[in-house]
């Protein structure tokens, strides 16, 4: 996997397929490899050259000392786009990756042709706030947590029927049962970024100044970014499109990759 040193941090990335460039930004604690079992193959088949990368704090990218901010992550993504010489390009992100893309759309419109914000563009819920504090404080403990900590947290998002599906559970375990200890500087850094972001009350002002085309994708059963909150953001971003996918949780890109990819490709075909 190639890498680039941006903002003093080595960021590991990969390029898939050929066509118009599209950068995918990962969620918190999510490895770039996870795109491979969700929407990445579908976007490549649709004719995009897809760039994936591991955020700072996620191996094999560097994990500088905590804390981080979402602005740090967005600056890394912007610098990677500049390093690759692909801007302005389309960007899409899930969860924390959605926050990164939101900042890129607002602050670096010179690099962004259009942005898809998946399960993350919304006024913060009380659940998001307390969840972020819990994650940060857990990551700061001077103890070694099980390597399965991340996957056990993720599985709680899924409906009971999905947890009873051995193939689905095995897939999540293979992706998110970390090879490195759960408690590490990168994990703490990313959770610290989540705390700052979820307690930021200035989002509506940022939404109002976004000038690039934006798609917000929400999932019916998402407790982090519930549809009623996502619709508030969609109404506040000038000209934003909104798609809601039924029957999915916060992990919608893994549950219904076809529907998510269709929403993105339909939107990007117009922008």
Residue ranges and their predicted role:
Residues 106, 114-144:
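Flexible "cap/lid" loop of the alpha/beta hydrolase fold
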Residues 210, 216-218:
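Short beta-strand/loop motif that positions the catalytic acidic residue
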Residues 223-229:
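Conserved alpha/beta-hydrolase "acid-adjacent" motif
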Residues 52, 56-92, 262:
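Active-site loop/oxyanion-hole signature of alpha/beta-hydrolase fold enzymes
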Residues 148-201, 206:
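Conserved alpha/beta-hydrolase catalytic His-Asp/Glu region
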Residues 240-271:
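Catalytic active-site module of serine/aspartate enzymes centered on a nucleophile-bearing elbow/loop
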Residues 6-62:
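Conserved HGGG/HGGXW glycine-rich cap/lid loop of the alpha/beta-hydrolase fold
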Residues 98-109, 115:
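Short glycine-enriched nucleophile-adjacent loop
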């Amino acid at each position: 996997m190639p890498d680039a040193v941006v903002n003093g941090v080595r960021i590991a990335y990969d390029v898939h397929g050929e066509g118009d460039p599209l950068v995918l930004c990962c969620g918190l604690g999510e490895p770039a490899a996870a795109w491979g079992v969700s929407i990445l193959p579908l976007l490549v088949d649709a004719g995009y050259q897809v760039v994936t990368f591991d955020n700072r704090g996620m191996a094999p990218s560097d994990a500088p000392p905590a804390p981080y901010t979402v602005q740090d992550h967005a600056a890394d993504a912007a610098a990677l786009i500049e390093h690759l010489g692909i801007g302005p390009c389309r960007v899409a992100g899930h969860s924390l990756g959605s926050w990164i893309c939101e900042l890129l759309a607002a602050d670096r419109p010179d690099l962004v042709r259009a942005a898809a914000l998946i399960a993350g563009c919304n006024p913060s819920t009380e659940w998001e706030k307390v969840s972020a504090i819990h994650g940060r404080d857990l990551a700061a403990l001077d103890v070694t947590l099980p390597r399965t900590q991340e996957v056990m947290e993720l599985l709680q998002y899924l409906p009971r029927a999905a947890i009873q599906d051995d193939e689905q559970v095995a897939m999540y375990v293979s992706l998110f049962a970390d090879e490195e200890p759960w408690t590490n500087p990168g994990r703490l850094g990313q959770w610290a970024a989540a705390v700052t972001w979820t307690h930021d009350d200035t989002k509506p002002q940022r939404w109002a100044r976004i000038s690039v085309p934006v798609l917000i994708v929400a999932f019916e059963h998402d407790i982090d970014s519930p549809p009623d909150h996502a619709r508030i953001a969609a109404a506040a971003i000038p000209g934003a499109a909104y798609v809601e996918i039924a029957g999915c949780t916060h992990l919608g890109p893994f549950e219904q990759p076809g529907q998510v990819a269709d929403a993105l490709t339909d939107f990007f075909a117009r922008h």
